[in-house]
Regions:
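Predominantly soluble domains enriched in secretory-pathway, periplasmic, or organellar proteins
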Residues: 1-310
Length: 310
C-alpha cells in the first residue's frame, strides 16, 4: 500500500530520514557524514542526492565536505559517495528537466554539472559563479541558466553552465542575498536579502532589480506556491513566516513559528507546507487557513525535506 513519506535531512543528527506523514512516525534513518545539508531527487524519485556540506552553517569555518551522497529512496541504502574534490563545501543542488545534476561549491565558487549523476564518478563540467561564498542557486528548467546567491560579495550572478565562454552577469540586490524563487515563466527571480532585510524581484533578462520592499527580520528562504500568486518567506530572525503577494511583494499574512524556520517543502497535491523548525519539529502548515495543523517530532535540526509516495 502506497504511503506518503517525508524525506528529511536532519543536519545535526547527521542523517537522512523517512517519516510517515499521517502518523509522524520516523520509519528509518540513514547515518551520513557530519553535516549533510541540501538534497534533490531525480524525476522518477528513485535516488536522492545529498550534498555533504560538512560544516554546520555558512558562518562556520572549515574545509567542509566534498562529496555527493547517492541514496536509493526505496531501499533506504547509501548507494555510493561521489567525490568531487577539490570542490568543497557543497551546498546548493538542483536538477534540470533532463535529470542532470548541478552542485555549487561554496568555497571554490564553482558550479559543477554531472550529466548522468547515477553513473558519473566526477563532474563533467564546471563554471565559475562570478561571486564569493556562493551558497544557493536557481536553475531554469532546461539547465541552460543558473542564478547564484553569493553571500560575501553580496551579488546575484547569472551564469550559463553549458556555455564556457559566457561571462557571469552580476546584480547587487542588497546585503547577503540568500533566499530565492524563480517564477514559472523564468522571467523574474525573487531574492531575499538577510542583512538588508529586503525582498526584491529581479528581471532575469537584464539582471536589474525591478521591485524592492522591506521585509521582516532576517529573511532566509523564499518558496513560490504552485499558483505563482503567493510566496512564503522564512523570517529566521523574527521566528515567523510571511505570506507575500508575488507581484507586489507586499505581505498578505504573518504567522509566528515560535522557533526559527530553517526550510520548507510543499505537499504535491494538498495545500500544505512542511516547515522545518530549529526546535526539532516539522510544522504542518495549512496554506488555506495560514495556521499550523500539527507537528512532527524529529531528530536534531531538521532541514530540507520532500514529500514522496512510496
Amino acid at each position: 500500500m502506497a504511503r506518503e513519506t517525508l524525506l528529511l535531512v536532519e543536519k545535526c543528527a547527521h542523517c537522512f530520514s523517512w517519516y510517515d506523514i499521517e502518523t509522524g512516525q520516523r520509519l528509518y534513518s540513514l547515518q551520513l557524514p557530519d553535516y549533510p545539508h541540501e538534497f534533490v531527487t531525480d524525476s522518477a524519485e528513485r535516488y536522492a542526492y545529498v550534498g555533504h556540506y560538512g560544516v554546520e552553517t555558512s558562518g562556520h569555518v572549515g574545509a567542509g565536505g566534498h562529496s555527493l551522497l547517492q541514496i536509493d529512496i526505496r531501499s533506504r541504502q547509501l548507494v555510493r559517495s561521489i567525490d568531487l574534490s577539490p570542490f568543497n563545501r557543497l551546498h546548493g543542488l538542483q536538477m534540470d528537466e533532463q535529470d542532470r545534476l548541478y552542485a555549487l561549491s561554496e568555497e571554490k565558487a564553482m558550479l559543477l554539472v554531472l550529466d548522468s549523476p547515477s553513473r558519473d564518478t566526477a563532474a563533467r563540467r564546471a563554471v565559475p559563479s562570478g561571486g564569493v561564498q556562493s551558497h544557493l542557486f536557481a536553475l531554469t528548467r532546461d539547465g541552460q541558466t543558473a542564478f547564484c546567491m553569493n553571500l560575501l560579495s553580496h551579488t546575484v550572478t547569472k551564469v550559463r553552465p553549458w556555455d564556457p565562454l559566457f561571462a557571469p552577469v552580476a546584480c547587487h540586490p542588497g546585503q547577503k542575498p540568500e533566499g530565492f524563487a524563480l517564477s514559472a515563466d523564468e522571467r523574474t527571480l525573487y531574492v531575499s536579502n538577510r542583512w538588508s532585510q529586503t525582498l526584491v524581484a529581479i528581471d532575469t533578462e537584464t539582471m536589474q532589480v525591478k521591485t524592492c520592499v522591506a521585509s521582516r527580520d532576517d529573511p532566509t528562504r523564499l518558496y513560490l506556491q504552485a499558483d505563482g500568486l503567493r510566496m512564503l518567506v522564512t523570517n529566521y530572525g523574527e521566528r515567523s513566516l510571511s505570506i507575500v503577494d508575488s507581484l507586489t511583494l507586499k505581505e498578505l499574512a504573518h504567522v509566528s513559528t515560535g522557533a526559527r524556520a530553517i526550510a520548507l517543502s510543499f505537499h504535491p497535491t494538498r495545500a500544505l507546507a512542511y516547515v522545518s523548525l530549529d526546535d526539532d519539529r516539522v510544522g504542518i502548515f495549512n496554506l488555506a487557513s495560514c495556521e499550523f495543523d500539527g507537528y512532527i517530532a524529529t531528530q536534531r535540526e531538521p532541514d530540507v525535506s520532500k514529500v514522496v509516495v512510496l
